[in-house]
Regions:
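Catalytic core of non-heme Fe(II) oxygenases with the double-stranded beta-helix
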Residues: 113-194
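Structured loops at beta-to-helix junctions and adjacent beta-edge loops in soluble globular domains
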Residues: 71-74, 124, 160, 197-199, ...
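Non-heme Fe(II)/2-oxoglutarate
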Residues: 5-121
Length: 234
């Protein structure tokens, strides 16, 4: 009788472990407790699906079988690579041609009082918990970010209705490894709106569906103004 395969769990050699966590950057008090905040669900019923389905996507793998449509990038081109490859931190992004095809989405995104980095729409194919956990990771959001500036975090807006899917989150221990007991699950119905310190928290999307999940991911610089804006959205 064959043994049941062990479920994957990150170890000390995982690439995310080397990403720094303890730095002097400004961090928002609203994020301190759990490392994530769930905001009020957005009514996006007025936004047609063409604003995410008809964009130019890149075959870019991160957190599963994914494709990304950049709305803002380092230089305004349809590019997914890290800003540091151009010697920049993940801020001061320029909007891409895709942004012109998503006017309603962009109206809301531009209303967020923050310095933007990457803004992308993710297209994630279905994946179970056991499949997703193999892609759990932390983001290197703050590479080259000056230490006297704001810590870069990420914000999500769910575009498709996937109430049985969720963002799987784990806090980090003193060795930068995920703490199993800290597991949190953020549901992903249409309009779900949440912000994650994705350099602190290990994360991955579990998508229990039979169609792709679409969501906007927005890199933003932490600031007192953004902190108050998030509180107002809770």
């Amino acid at each position: 009788m064959s043994a049941t395969p062990a479920i994957f769990w990150p170890h000390s050699e995982h690439w995310s472990v080397k990403i720094p966590l303890q730095t002097p950057h400004y961090r928002m008090p609203v994020m301190k407790d759990k490392g994530f905040v769930i905001m009020k669900t957005l009514d996006i019923s007025n936004i047609p699906s063409s604003e995410w389905e008809n964009l130019t996507y890149m075959d870019w793998k991160s957190g599963g079988d994914t494709n990304f449509a950049p709305l803002a990038s380092c230089d305004g081109t349809i590019e997914c690579k890290g800003f540091w490859e151009n010697g920049k931190t993940d801020k001061d992004a320029k909007f891409t041609p895709n942004a012109d095809l998503a006017p309603n989405l962009m109206k809301y995104i531009r209303s967020i009082p923050a310095n933007f980095g990457r803004v992308r729409i993710i297209k994630l194919e279905p994946q179970t918990h056991d499949q997703a956990i193999r892609s759990v990771h932390r983001d290197d959001n703050n590479r080259l970010n000056p230490e006297d500036e704001g810590w870069v975090v990420r914000m999500w807006i769910e575009l498709t209705d996937n109430p049985d899917s969720y963002m799987l989150l784990y806090d980090s221990d003193e060795n930068n490894l995920p703490i199993k007991e800290s597991e949190a699950r953020v549901p992903m119905p249409k309009g779900a709106h949440f912000v994650v310190d994705s350099q602190r928290l290990w994360h991955v999307g579990v998508h229990n569906g039979n169609k792709p999940r679409y969501a906007v991911i927005i890199s933003t610089e932490s600031s007192p103004e953004l902190n108050e804006w998030i509180i107002g959205k809770m």
